[in-house]
Amino acid sequence: MGQLEEKTALITGAASGIGRAAALLFAQEGASIVSADIDAERGKDIVNEIERLNGKAHFVPCDVTRADHCQNAVEHAVQRFGGLDILFNNAGIIVRQSVVELGETDWDRVMDVNVKSIFLMSKYAIPVMRSGGGGTIINTSSGWGVVGGPQAAAYCASKGAVVLLTRSMAIDFGPDRVRVNCICPGDTDTSMLRDEARQMRREEDEFMADAANRPLGRVGTTEDIAKAALFLASDQSSFVTGTSLIVDGGGLA
């Protein structure tokens, strides 16, 4: 029996990267998956892939910065699969600029996608979890939510906010048997990381080689992060809440 049998997991940003890897792994472990993403084509692709593997999945279009979309995603989970046990708030973006270079629109966009989305999804998910006897929420922060990084002011601010929002939620809803934790990935091989090379006007190969400069000598894979998310989603972490799990190959050691 899989670790997530008879569980329903709602994953934001499930169309690609870490979210996609988590959707596949969670489904392999028995969970029914709600793929929530603004990218309908790739969001549906992951559903089709899960169904080809005899899993259960459903796609819901979702702009995570909009309250009505977040509420709709939670309602779809309940209507389709009968409840909601796991929420993986994974959608995120990065803009590599300092506060001087950064425009107000980009600041707002980063904060909305990276932080406001967690507030909105959790606002609608927690009452469902509470009525069902509990659940678990995983928020994606970053190593740069623990320490600062260069030319990433809005990103660092947003990911630091995720760490403390996670702790606050864990305190508030622990009595309701809702656990809340966050993952702090280091550099992980995704399209978002590779896009940073473009933003920084650097050659991609050189940028990725620098990103691998850590004790384990490589960047992370999406599967590395998905496995950490699985631990936090499963009963293996039943006494873990309010924590930040750093998964970075020793980058912050």
For the regions a language model picked out, list residue spans one by one.
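Substrate-binding pocket helix/loop in short-chain dehydrogenase/reductase
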Residues: 98-99, 106-108, 210
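Active-site loop immediately N-terminal to the catalytic Tyr-X3-Lys motif
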Residues: 100, 147-153, 175-176, 217, ...
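Active-site helix of classical SDR
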Residues: 122, 158, 166
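Alpha-helical segment proximal to the catalytic Tyr-Lys
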Residues: 127, 171-175, 238
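Residue(s) in the substrate-gating loop at a strand-loop-helix junction
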Residues: 142
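Short C-terminal tail/terminal secondary-structure segment
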Residues: 147, 230, 241-253
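A glycine/serine/threonine-rich, flexible loop-to-helix segment
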Residues: 175, 187-213
